[in-house]
């Protein structure tokens, strides 16, 4: 049950489009809070709340560098939660086929 409760926080965090976009932005590497906020047309405090939710879900990690707070995507956590969910609800062939398709499309965009 603890894992289920833990994963609920991940899926709640992923339910918001702003938080999903933050995760996509962090895919490129570490970003300062101000850099993240500059990518959105919402207030700094709102971005801070979104980052707090993502951090509580274990999807981002933060570190301080002087007076800046830097955020990184915790890829392993995201992959583990989504992987467990997909394994539980989708036949393996569908997951593998979609993953291969997504990776191929991303490679062509580069």
Per-range role (PLM):
Residues 55-65, 72:
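Beta-hairpin "wing" of winged helix-turn-helix
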Residues 38, 49, 55-56:
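Alpha-helical residues within the helix-turn-helix
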Residues 2-45, 67-78:
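N-terminal helix-turn-helix DNA-binding core of bacterial DNA-binding proteins
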Residues 1-6, 27, 74-110:
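Amphipathic alpha-helical dimerization/coiled-coil segments
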Residues 30-31, 55, 86:
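Residue-level detector of secondary-structure transition/capping positions
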Residues 18, 64, 107-110:
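Intrinsically disordered, low-complexity regions of eukaryotic proteins
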Residues 43-45, 49, 107:
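Intrinsic disorder/low-complexity segments
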């Amino acid at each position: 049950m603890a894992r289920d409760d833990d994963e609920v926080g991940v899926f709640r965090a992923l339910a918001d489009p702003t938080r999903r976009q933050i995760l996509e932005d962090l895919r490129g590497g570490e970003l300062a809070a101000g850099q993240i906020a500059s990518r959105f047309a919402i207030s700094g405090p709102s971005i801070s709340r979104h980052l707090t939710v993502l951090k509580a879900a274990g999807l981002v990690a933060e570190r301080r560098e002087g007076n800046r707070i830097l955020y990184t995507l915790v890829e392993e956590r995201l992959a583990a939660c989504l992987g467990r969910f997909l394994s539980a609800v989708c036949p393996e062939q569908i997951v593998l086929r979609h993953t291969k398709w997504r990776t191929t499309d991303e490679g062509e965009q580069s």
